[in-house]
């Protein structure tokens, strides 16, 4: 019900007009919005510092980070934290039955949304197109926008794509994936 109410506000022309008259704009901070990813980076810096302060690790010790994800946003924030210097060894994507990311990592870089969609007890992970993965592909490909655009075109037209081996090697050295179903 809350989701429908929020969605209604975003599509209600009268509400949007009233906000506009007051010089306001309504925005969302979902996981494809950079405004949501930026503060998530701080979670990983803070968590690392907390482990240091508790004596769980020593400065410079690498940690593994496991993040439940469907849209690849929060785990991408962890990747950014790693790029900024947080010693993270592996970034582990935990998925539900809609395990498109797990299959991407296990297949060596083939992303295939052509599969049954499962409605699960983790609806925020019920996703077959992980839009933030596109950002990672852009970064690890050396900002190759033409390659990424071609992959996204393939995804749109055929429902799948395979990343070049050299790009996946960079990804595969840092990420892995796993999944469980609702029973597990």
Where are these regions (language model features)?
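Active-site-adjacent helical/loop segments in soluble small-molecule enzymes
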Residues: 20-54, 59-62, 142-184
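Extended interaction regions within the primary functional domain
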Residues: 5, 29-35, 107, 118
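Structural signal for hydrophobic packing residues in well-ordered secondary-structure cores
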Residues: 6, 10-17, 45-55, 82-86, ...
């Amino acid at each position: 019900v809350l989701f429908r109410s929020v969605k209604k506000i975003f599509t209600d022309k009268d509400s949007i007009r009233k906000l506009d008259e007051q010089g306001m704009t309504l925005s969302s901070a979902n996981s494809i919005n950079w405004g949501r990813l930026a503060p998530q980076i701080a979670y990983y810096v803070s968590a690392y510092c907390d482990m240091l302060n508790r004596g769980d690790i020593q400065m410079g010790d690498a940690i593994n980070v496991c993040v439940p994800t469907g849209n690849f946003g929060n785990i991408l924030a962890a990747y950014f934290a790693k790029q900024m210097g947080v010693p993270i060894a592996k970034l582990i994507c935990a998925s539900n039955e809609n395990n498109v990311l797990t299959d991407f990592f296990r297949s060596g870089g083939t992303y295939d949304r052509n599969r049954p969609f499962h409605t699960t007890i983790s609806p925020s992970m019920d996703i077959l197109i992980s839009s933030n993965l596109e950002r990672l592909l852009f970064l690890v490909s050396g900002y190759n926008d033409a390659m990424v655009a071609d992959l996204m075109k393939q995804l749109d037209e055929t429902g799948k794509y395979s990343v070049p081996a050299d790009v996946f090697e960079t990804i595969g050295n840092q990420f892995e994936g796993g999944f469980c179903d609702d029973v597990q």
